[in-house]
Amino acid sequence: VRSTSICASSPGRRQMVRVITDIVLPYLAFEGLWTVTKLLVEGRADPNITKPSWTLWFLLALAIFRLVLPYLALLRWPLLWTLLISIGAGYLPNIDSTFSLSRTLGLLPFFTLGWWVHEHRLVERFALLRTRWWLTAASAVAFVVAGWAAWYFLDIWQAMELRQWLFYDDDYASIGQTGWWAGGVRLLLMLVALLLSIAFFSLVPREGHRWTHFGQYTMYVYLLHSFVL
C-alpha cells in the first residue's frame, strides 16, 4: 500500500523512464547477483529473468502496476475491479509465477488502494495522521488478538496451508482448494490484512526522530536483506 501511494495516475515520459531506472534495472542487476550467488554457494546457476528470485518478485509487481495504473485510473471503480481480478485470478491455473504475474494480480487491490488513498488525499481530508487514543488502543488489541489466534489455532492454519494462501503464488487448486468458495477465503484474508495494516500505521509514531530520514533508504534494505538471510 505505502509503496504505491506516491504513484501518479497519468505517468508521462519522465515517470516511465523512472520505472526503468528505479525498478527494472535494479531488478536485472540483482537477478545477476543472485545468479552468481547460486553458482558460488550451490555450484549451479539457472538464470531466468522471467522467474524472479526470492524477494525480487516485488520489483516486477511494482513495475507492472505502474505500467497499468493509467488504465486503472480510467475505471469508475478501480478498487472493485482489482478486487475481482485478484479473486478471479486464483481460479485460473495457467496464471503462475512467470514475471511474478500471480502475485501481481493477487495483490493488485493493495497496490491500487495505496494509489487511490493518495489520489483522493484521504489522509489530509480525514486527518488520518492525528493520533487518537482509542484508535491506538484498538490497534494494540488487534495485534494481541491476531497473535493469540495465530498461536492458538496453529494446527488449523497448518492444515489449511495458510502459508501458501498468504504467498499469493499459487492458484486455489494447487493449494488443494477446488471449491467455489476459495475466492471468499482470499477476500477474507485481504480484509484481515487491511485491518492489521491500518492498526500498524496507527501505532507508528507521528513525530520525527533522528533516525526518521533513514526511512527513505528502505529499498536498499529490502534488496540486500535477502542475501543475509
Label every model-predicted segment.
Residues 1-229:
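Alpha-helical transmembrane segments and their immediate juxtamembrane cytosolic regions
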